[in-house]
From Swiss-Prot:
PROSITE patterns: SECA, SECA_MOTOR_DEAD. This is Protein translocase subunit SecA. Its EC number is 7.4.2.8. ATP binds at residues 89, 107-111, 514.
């Protein structure tokens, strides 16, 4: 029977196992070459890079070089770091080179695994971008791996915010560049806004290897990168409406005391929307009229008051759905957004659609002007620009469908080097938040008493501080890691494995830094003023004792204080324990007051808990509860996936247009002489003008010519009198072509006159400047129009129309009009040069 089962499993392996079986054959080839590499001296080993490059130039594909190149990297790592890369790391490297997502557990050595495909793809000379979630990790990984890459004859660059154009160019020209997803994306947008090709820093996007790929391509997918400029000041409107909304909220609280009274607004926490009821609309309109912001008898839903409606909705959302210390913090008179997935502050990022200004009014800090979008792109569309893309993370399998459907990336789960022995206890659920916190504190106390380190994961700063206060009350020493102390997070998380240490971390703060059982001895050595051999040996000996005592106590114990909306985030928290076969454990404590259960859990679970008549302090621990919570999480994940997919479908429309604009702009930027382009545009513009004012081949009305003359004078500085000539030359009635030739002749004559006055080189510079400025100005206006269209397009659904199809159709029409207007404005601005020259 056992033999039959083994045979069945062998015949019907799952897809992941089949991929790994094939890749293990390549690993065997790499292992076979290991002894040959050991025989090479340092010069011979590092010279392999030049040999590989020569082979690539002769036409050999890099895939053919993979086994030998990986064997070279393994031997080099051994000599530089005194570490032998495991076979599972080789598997990870092969997966990453194959345009896939590699799921590698925490502590399996992802940083060094990335060096394998990075080295191989850098041999092409086209550049490799290694993408991290923050600047600390980019700098850390680049600094750590630099000796290895330099030994192999490759140079390493670091792309950081605030660098000069020159420094960024050096970073991007390097064989391997480390940087954050934000910085790569912003550099792309900035490159498409420059007026001189020498100011562009990026080269063609060849290969991107994304660390923590789930965080970047999924968690941050809903937030586009935006370069913006200030628009009109509307701070007074936000302040006034903030007062009115505070009034409504106060009245609503009073209304709630009487169940028979209708509320002024309804709240949908699932979709994060606040909607005015009928009586709420009547009240806000009354208050707006009394404040003088709206005229008597006007409706808030009229087209004249659409901006007021927008402000009211933003203020309601700011007060009801967004909380300080959860969604944002107030620091130095500024509202700083907290990343809901990592708990980190995101400086420089602002909510759009007036929400940020509404929160500034709510918190009574200085209201900054609303921003107008100058350029934007989503991470989804930016990373799809790369010729080759791959990524790695500790948790990807739950999102494998999304990686495949949106990015065309398969997910491969890499086995651990040592068996995973962490114990994941079932969830414990309490009726109230207070009971849950008491149970968490009790669990922490037990761990501290037996010197077991504890990592407590929370979903917000507010929750982390509630736990912190409860621990202080009990006299339990602990460290808090949240958005407020971002700078120290790596040091705090590195020492979270110290015997009896208690660390409270917001979500996945400190991600990317391993928790070493017994504490991080390397940081202790780094802190020594006189790092002599005796002191180093003493530190290592002390660490060994601590490490062994932590293992005896059960390893790192992870406590989740609440289930996250995504199972993947929960798995990331659990994954901090049990690294490299270490002992460890995890447990989640829940309450019926938790957001996930309150909003998304099924009514069956809620009813069951109520029927059981649990007493104060009692809890339920059952696998069925864990399954019910997982089901609720799947519902949320499905909803969030739909939101991201919809965002991509809409952004794909803008992306197609963005590519056209940026491609044309870059062609013009690279041209030394754009006069031929101007010449062709001039013909198109004149044809378009004639089709507007003289739609038929013959002139039917003298008034048409008068309108044409006015247009030519106002927009093109041309004084022509076709209407007067008509009395003398009746052939003009049938001479549309004659008029066309006349206009073009005068325009060209005018153009040549200016060119002679300023010189060819100056004229080229002026023309290019006009084209680029016009491109940017109209693209900015078009983006604003697209935003307005997008915000209201869902209303088409009420007319039985598909909003997505309507958006595609209308945006295409808007884009075509914008391109026509672009040509018109370019010729208009160039024609006005003579007028400017005369005035000088």
């Amino acid at each position: 029977m056992i033999f039959t089962l083994k045979l069945f499993k062998k015949l019907f392996r799952n897809r992941n196992e089949r991929i790994l079986v094939h890749m293990k054959k390549i690993v065997d080839m790499i292992n076979y070459m290991e002894k040959d590499m050991e025989k090479l001296n340092d010069n011979q080993l590092s010279n392999k890079t030049n040999e590989f490059r020569m082979q690539i130039k002769s036409g050999i594909n890099i895939e053919e070089l993979l086994p030998q190149a990986f064997a070279v990297v393994r031997e080099s790592v051994k000599r530089i770091f005194n570490i032998r890369l495991f076979d599972v790391q080789m598997l990870g490297g092969i997966v990453l080179n194959n345009r896939c997502i590699a799921e590698m557990r925490t502590g399996e050595g992802k940083t060094l695994t990335a060096t394998l495909p990075a080295y191989l793809n850098a041999l092409t000379g086209k550049g490799v971008h290694i993408v991290t979630v923050n600047n600390y990790l980019a700098h850390r990984d680049a600094t750590y791996n630099q000796p290895l890459f330099e030994f192999l004859g490759l140079n390493v660059g670091i792309n950081l915010p605030g660098q000069t154009v020159c420094a960024k160019k050096i970073a991007y020209e390097s064989d391997i560049t480390y940087g954050t997803n934000n910085e790569y994306g912003f550099d792309y947008l900035r490159d498409n806004m420059v007026f001189n090709v020498k100011e562009q820093v990026q080269r063609e996007l060849h290969y991107a290897l994304i660390d923590e790929v789930d965080s970047i391509l999924i968690d941050e997918a809903r937030t586009p990168l935006i370069i913006s400029g200030p628009s009109d000041d509307a701070s007074l409107s936000y302040l006034k409406i903030n007062e009115l909304v505070c009034n409504i909220i106060k009245r609503n609280i009073d209304h709630c005391k009487y169940p028979e009274k209708e509320e002024y607004f309804t709240v949908d926490e699932k979709s994060r929307q606040v909607v005015l009821t009928e009586i709420g609309l009547i009240l806000i309109e009354k208050l707006l009229i009394e404040s003088g912001m709206m005229g008597m008898g006007e409706s808030l839903y009229s087209s004249d008051n659409i901006i007021l409606l927008h402000h009211v909705n933003s203020a309601l959302r700011a007060h009801i759905l967004f909380a300080c210390e959860v969604d944002y913090i107030v620091k130095n008179g500024e509202i700083l957004i907290i990343d809901e997935h990592t708990g980190r502050v995101m400086p420089g990022r602002r909510w759009s659609d007036g929400l940020h200004q509404a929160i500034e009014a709510k918190e009574r800090v200085r209201i900054q002007n609303e921003n107008q979008t100058l350029a934007s792109i989503t991470f989804q569309n930016y990373f799809r620009l790369y010729e080759k893309l791959s990524g790695m993370t500790g948790t990807a399998s739950t999102e494998s469908f999304e990686f495949k459907s949106i990015y065309k990336l398969d997910t491969v789960v890499i086995p651990t080097n040592q068996p995973m022995i962490r114990i994941d206890f079932p969830d414990v659920i309490y009726m109230t938040e207070i009971e849950k916190i008491n149970a968490i504190v009790s669990d922490i106390k037990d761990c501290v008493n037996r010197k077991q380190p504890v990592l407590v994961g929370t979903v917000s700063i507010d929750k982390s501080e509630i736990i912190s206060r409860a621990l202080k009350k009990e006299g339990i020493l602990h460290k808090v890691l949240n958005a407020k102390i971002h700078a120290a997070e790596a040091d705090i998380i590195a020492q979270a494995g110290y015997p009896g240490a208690v660390t409270i971390a917001t979500n996945m703060a400190g991600r990317g830094t391993d928790i070493v059982l017994g504490g991080n001895w390397r940081s202790e050595i780094a802190a020594l003023r006189n790092a002599n051999t005796h002191a180093m040996l003493r530190i290592k000996s002390d660490w060994k004792e601590r490490h062994d005592s932590v293992l005896k106590s059960g390893g790192l114990h992870v406590i989740g204080t609440e289930r996250h909306e995504s199972r993947r985030i929960d798995n990331q928290l659990r994954g901090r324990s049990g690294r490299q076969g270490d002992a460890g454990s995890s447990r989640f404590y829940l309450s019926m007051e938790d957001s996930l259960i309150r909003i998304f859990a099924s009514n069956k679970l809620v009813d069951l808990m109520k029927r059981m008549g649990m007493k104060s302090g009692e809890s339920i621990e059952h696998p069925w509860i864990t399954k019910a919570i997982a089901h609720a999480q799947k519902k949320v994940e499905s909803r969030n996936f739909d939101i991201r997919k919809q965002l991509l479908e809409y952004d794909d429309v803008a992306n197609d247009q963005r590519r056209v604009i940026y491609e044309q702009r870059n062609k013009l930027l690279a041209m030394l002489d754009v006069s031929e382009v101007i010449h062709n545009i001039r013909y198109d513009v004149v044809d378009r003008i004639l089709n507007i004012y003289i739609p038929l081949e013959i002139i039917e009305n003298k008034k048409d010519l008068i309108k044409l003359e006015k247009c030519l004078k106002d927009d093109f500085n041309l004084v022509l009198s076709f209407s007067e000539q008509l009395d003398e030359d009746t052939s003009l009635y049938e001479g549309k072509e004659k008029i066309r030739v006349c206009i073009l002749t005068e325009m060209i004559k005018q153009y040549k006159c200016v060119k002679e006055m300023v010189g060819i080189n100056v004229m080229n510079a002026i023309e290019k400047g006009i084209i680029l400025k016009t491109f940017d100005a109209l693209w900015k206006e078009h983006l604003a129009s697209m935003d307005y269209l997008r915000q209201g397009i869902h209303l088409r659904g009420y007319a039985q129309k598909d909003p997505k199809q309507e958006y595609k159709k209308e945006s295409f029409s808007m884009f075509k009009k914008m391109l026509d207007h672009l040509q018109y404005e370019i010729i208009s601005e160039i024609s006005k040069l003579q007028k400017l020259n005369r005035s000088n």
